[in-house]
Amino acid sequence: MSRVRRLLLGYLFPALLLHGLGEGSALLHPDSRSHPRSLEKSAWRAFKESQCHHMLKHLHNGARITVQMPPTIEGHWVSTGCEVRSGPEFMTRSYRFYNNNTFKAYQFYYGSNRCTNPTYTLIIRGKIRLRQASWIIRGGTEADYQLHGVQVICHTEAVAEQLSRLVNRTCPGFLAPGGPWVQDVAYDLWQEESNHECTKAVNFAMHELQLIRVEKQYPHHSLDHLVEELFLGDIHTDATQRVFYRPSSYQPPLQNAKNHNHACIACRIIFRSDEHHPPILPPKADLTIGLHGEWVSQRCEVRPEVLFLTRHFIFHDNNNTWEGHYYHYSDPVCKHPTFTIYARGRYSRGVLSSKVMGGTEFVFKVNHMKVTPMDAATASLLNVFSGNECGAEGSWQVGIQQDVTHTNGCVALGIKLPHTEYEIFKMEQDTRGRYLLFNGQRPSDGSSPDRPEKRATSYQMPLVQCASSSPRAEELLEDSQGHLYGRAAGRTAGSLLLPAFVSLWTLPHWRILR
């Protein structure tokens, strides 16, 4: 396989698939002409322009976010809610970084998806040193860290007994004589001055400190209210690989306890907590998943292997079809587009997950896809492929959309049609009462969740609902001439739908980028 071909397979395809579902960008501007019978659809387009498109346009215009380079991480940073790691693991985090470069981190673990019943807490101490700007992830900073100690404290007798058995089985002879562990007593899992270590019993790794990004923003354009967010490196989706994995994306951000969203109740609870008083978040009922309406990204999203994108998904619950628009960029603030993907297909009825509390399982199929190169480099790469591997041979031009369904996808992007993926979703509401939609995190090894056993057990960054219902795809396609990224975009509304499906299938190919 040629070097150019490998580059295509490793860069373009992963970027497309890793990103998720999403409908149009604010950059899609429907043509002012209307169909004779399109009064209702014209009203819909006007609403969409003022909602979904406006929200994405806000992101593409910078969203009043500034990135600190190099980042200042001194301070107290806390989770904004109950987080889900692969496994699944339900947790909250409380990290303190001091001016002498030392840190103390709490990782609170729970037995349910609402973080209401703490099971055990890890207390991690160490030292961190910021290095240079990351050459892997633009906008990030690389760091080195050194652990001084890791302790665990159990919050119930049952968990103490269970965890001590697990440690003894994982590291024979590790436990001192005297019986199992007891509740509310801190035990060492690792000490700097000794070789006595058994952190693998709890799948512990702190490599998230190897990649750091700090963002500052003023919500609602209020200069009186600063919110600071700390993004730390992502965690491998296979718990056994965590200690070997170097981050290439981010976890959900922590907020600065001093400069946080004032509506964040969880922030205040976690801020006041410690290993003897773990945070107990307010109980909430799980929302029933209804895949309908339109959903867009809330920020410029980062995927492993240097992929930046925004997503726009459209779900039609009347016939269980979906559309996704994926807008890919070369920069971490999503200002310089590289290519877009529009995908559509069908999805199954949801079934409550027996493995991930609060999750609902779906099966997604994609059978139609369009691609639009948005810069000369991407168009050139696509033109390298010959025959029926990715659209019409040698015909790719910047800003011109092509349907790749007839070539069964696009080899250059690692996409083969038709394709099936096994997904998991959950729905929540934010502090403003808006609905958020989370879909499954892509496997860190770049594979595709194309079998039930490969279904995700954790989630990507959420999309926010921007419209509660949507017209049928056929109506959009026949009556819209949207332009992505201004004049340089595709000619049909189909280009808006593409990113949603791409988001589902891009992650496997992201791995190829590595």
Curated annotation (Swiss-Prot):
TM segments? 493-513
Q: Which Pfam families match?
A: APCDDC
Top-rank taxon = Eukaryota
Localization recorded for this chain is: Cell membrane
Q: Which UniProt keywords apply?
A: Cell membrane, Glycoprotein, Membrane, Signal, Transmembrane, Transmembrane helix, Wnt signaling pathway
**Induction summary:** APCDD1 is transcriptionally regulated by the CTNNB1/TF7L2 complex.
Query: What does the entry give for GO biological process?
Result: astrocyte cell migration; hair follicle development; negative regulation of Wnt signaling pathway; regulation of odontogenesis of dentin-containing tooth; Wnt signaling pathway
Tell me the GO molecular function terms. Answer: identical protein binding; Wnt-protein binding
Q: How is it modified after translation?
A: N-Glycosylated.
Membrane association type: Single-pass type I membrane protein
Segments on the Extracellular side according to the record's topology features: 27-492
Q: Can you supply one Gene Ontology CC term for this chain's record?
A: plasma membrane
Give the residue ranges for region: Disordered.
Answer: 437-459
Query: What residues bear carbohydrate chains?
Result: N100, N168, N319
Q: Which residues form the signal peptide?
A: 1-26
Q: Cytoplasmic compartment: which residues?
A: 514
**Its function?**
Negative regulator of the Wnt signaling pathway. Inhibits Wnt signaling in a cell-autonomous manner and functions upstream of beta-catenin. May act via its interaction with Wnt and LRP proteins.
Q: Which family does it belong to?
A: Belongs to the APCDD1 family.
Subunit composition and interactions: Homodimer. Interacts with LRP5 and WNT3A.
Name of the protein described by the UniProt record: Protein APCDD1
Q: Which organism is it from?
A: Mus musculus (Mouse)
Encoding gene (name)? Apcdd1
